[in-house]
Amino acid sequence: MSRRLPLFITLVILHAVALVTAHSQTFYFNDGRKVSLSEVRIKGANIVVSVKLAGTEGGSAELTLPISTLKRIDWPVPAAIAQAEDDLKADKPADALQKVNPLLSEQDPFREVSGSWWTQGAVVKAVALARLGKDVDADVMLELMRRAKADPDAIARGEIAIIDQLVASGKADAAKTRLDKIQNTASDDASLAAIAITKGRIFERAGRTEDALLSYLRVPVYYASENGKMPAALLGAIRALHNLGDEPRAAATLETLTTRYPNSPEAAEAKR
């Protein structure tokens, strides 16, 4: 019994994993039909399904269904998404592009279908292009997202990346114009935190140090759970406090940054 139990448990686990995997790779059509990903191939704007013919030995036929008749798809999370996001965090936009481009090609036919990963990949590409200084290409990506009816918060993330690049390039007026257009469309905390940081940078460039500080501090006050945005906000606050001559608070904020986010690029920059 002691030898059979582990084997039985293993088989149960493998069966459960197989069921989950099968479910997560399924096409659901408007007519109620559902087909496993392994049973189809994509041909242009259609999904070609292999169908076994009853009463024949090994007989099969192909059924062609338009992608437009898809209701949703269950697709496993592509590893390329997380890998490309990690590249962006490490300030490696070119590497992020290399990882996300194949994913976008794969997901492109399903860009408007619920469950597709195209929008997430498109956001990564827009951000990467913006950070590489390719604002026009990033704008093209955002327009594709709009046509695909992407979530406004996803579009806002790409917009913010372009705006950040404009600020870094000294084009503060153009950055402010674009920022004013998206402030009322973003609703998620990540986008709102990013907007606060970007506004802080615009104020900083304009010499409005107190306004910059207040904008940076909105992140720890209102969006404290956004750990991905916190290092940039704290670094901006440190710069502002230095410029205001408030060295004790600057030192305390530096301690917070280096203690809570020791491996962040912002912590390394703050120590220089």
Predicted regions and their residues:
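Compositionally biased alpha-helical segments
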Residues: V20-A150, R157-A168, D173, T177-N184, ...
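Bacterial N-terminal signal peptides
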Residues: F8-A18
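Extended low-complexity acidic/polar segments
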Residues: L144-D153, A224, T256-A267
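Extended alpha-helical scaffolding segments
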Residues: K229-A232, G236-R249
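TPR/TPR-like (Sel1-like) alpha-helical repeat modules
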Residues: Y216-V221, H242-P265
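Conserved positions within tetratricopeptide repeat
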Residues: L97-Q98, D139, D173-K176, E210-L213, ...
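Positively charged n-region of N-terminal signal peptides that target proteins for export
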Residues: M1-L5
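TPR alpha-solenoid repeat register
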Residues: I155, L192, K229-M230, A267
